[in-house]
């Protein structure tokens, strides 16, 4: 079986979860099963719940992981909703979310993620109603400007939005190739990534509501307060990493009083656990040589302890 995607930070993921023995492991973003396959092999007494919103990826992984079918339950779901759907929440001992786009999605012409694609789609869940085509051809100039500024951190967001609106007034923009030509190949000052790449990334975030989905997922975890559970999140965008970092910092605090208050009044017992990774873990030099797409990957991990704080 040809594997269409190389899992990032595979060794680092295995290291984070190496001490897990029994219970349930939740792979929120199964993709093509690389992380789960390695963990299933190394943890024979763990049971797995494997979720993905991409039907193609899910079907592939069912075949790839068929030897472990007695230990794994598959589910099609966006990872922001999965915690509301699964059983065995009390028995969760590990949770992994790799929230990047797979190589298969990027390289598949029909999915419309790549700047070279003949399509303009970018939906991770192909059943979603809104695609990149609708956003590019129906959003107002102000809406497009906001997307490019907030999600792409592009200094000339207004100019890019203006160019798109001008071109679509002549004919609808139907392909990623066409959009790429409109945006241009230049780079932002002091940034290595091209303007078009940042703009495409911003559109993809809007199509899939990626930042909202991440915040919803972390919010559900905060409410769930799993016990004796390790959470690892791999992100590929600075905005996503910032959100994860902020949540982990908040969860690790005992005192939640206003910083201006001189004396603690909250009980000083609100910590949900400890941050495992002092700094985000990045790909090694060896991995970068094998898989250049791992260059943006950052992993952070948190341990939910077994204390009932309230």
Swiss-Prot record:
Name it.
Ribosomal RNA small subunit methyltransferase H
Localisation: Cytoplasm
Query: Where mainly located?
Result: cytoplasm
Q: What class of enzyme is it?
A: transferase
Q: What family does the database annotate? A: Belongs to the methyltransferase superfamily. RsmH family.
Q: Name one GO molecular function term.
A: rRNA (cytosine-N4-)-methyltransferase activity
Question: InterPro entries attached here?
Answer: RsmH, SAM-dep_MeTrfase_MraW_recog, SAM-dependent_MTases_sf
**Pfam families linked to this entry:** Methyltransf_5
Outline what the protein does.
Answer: Specifically methylates the N4 position of cytidine in position 1402 (C1402) of 16S rRNA.
- Which keywords describe this protein according to UniProt? Cytoplasm, Methyltransferase, rRNA processing, S-adenosyl-L-methionine, Transferase
Q: Which reaction does it catalyse?
A: cytidine(1402) in 16S rRNA + S-adenosyl-L-methionine = N(4)-methylcytidine(1402) in 16S rRNA + S-adenosyl-L-homocysteine + H(+)
Q: Tell me which species this is from.
A: Campylobacter jejuni (strain RM1221)
Check the record and name the SUPFAM superfamilies matching this protein.
Answer: Putative methyltransferase TM0872, insert domain, S-adenosyl-L-methionine-dependent methyltransferases
Supply the EC number(s). Answer: 2.1.1.199
PANTHER family reported in the protein's UniProt record: 12S RRNA N4-METHYLCYTIDINE METHYLTRANSFERASE, S-ADENOSYL-METHYLTRANSFERASE MRAW
KW Cell cycle (keyword) present: no
Recorded hits in Gene3D superfamilies, A to Z, give: Putative methyltransferase TM0872, insert domain, Vaccinia Virus protein VP39
Indicate which residues the UniProt annotation says bind S-adenosyl-L-methionine.
33-35, 52, 79, 98, 105
Q: Which GO terms describe its biological process?
A: rRNA base methylation
- Annotated TM spans: none
Cellular component GO terms, alphabetical:
cytoplasm
């Amino acid at each position: 079986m040809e594997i269409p995607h190389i899992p990032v930070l595979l060794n680092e993921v295995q290291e984070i979860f190496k001490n897990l023995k029994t219970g349930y492991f939740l792979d929120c973003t199964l993709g093509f099963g690389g992380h789960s396959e390695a963990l299933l092999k190394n943890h024979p007494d763990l049971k797995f719940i494997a979720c993905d919103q991409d039907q193609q990826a899910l079907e592939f992984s069912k075949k790839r992981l068929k030897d472990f079918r007695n230990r794994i339950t598959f589910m099609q779901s966006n990872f922001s909703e999965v915690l509301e759907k699964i059983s065995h929440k009390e028995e969760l001992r590990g949770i992994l979310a790799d929230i990047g786009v797979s190589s298969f999605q990027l390289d598949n012409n029909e999915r419309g993620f790549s700047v070279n694609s003949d399509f303009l789609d970018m939906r991770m869940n192909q059943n979603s109603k809104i695609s990149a085509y609708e956003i590019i051809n129906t959003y107002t100039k102000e809406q497009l400007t906001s997307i490019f500024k907030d999600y792409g951190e592009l200094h000339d967001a207004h100019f890019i939005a203006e160019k798109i609106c001008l071109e679509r007034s002549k004919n609808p923009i139907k392909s990623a190739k066409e959009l790429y030509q409109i945006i241009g190949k230049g780079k932002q000052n002091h940034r290595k990534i091209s303007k078009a790449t940042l703009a495409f990334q911003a559109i993809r975030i809007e199509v899939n509501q990626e930042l909202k989905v991440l915040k919803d997922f972390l919010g559900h975890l905060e409410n769930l307060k799993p016990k004796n559970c390790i959470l690892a999140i791999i992100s590929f965008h600075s905005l996503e990493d910032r959100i994860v970092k902020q949540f982990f910092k908040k969860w690790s605090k005992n005192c939640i009083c206003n910083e201006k208050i001189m004396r603690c009044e909250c009980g000083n017992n609100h910590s949900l656990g400890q941050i495992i990774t002092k700094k985000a873990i990045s790909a090694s030099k060896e991995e970068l040589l094998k898989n250049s797409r791992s260059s943006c990957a950052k992993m952070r991990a948190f341990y939910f302890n077994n204390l009932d704080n309230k």
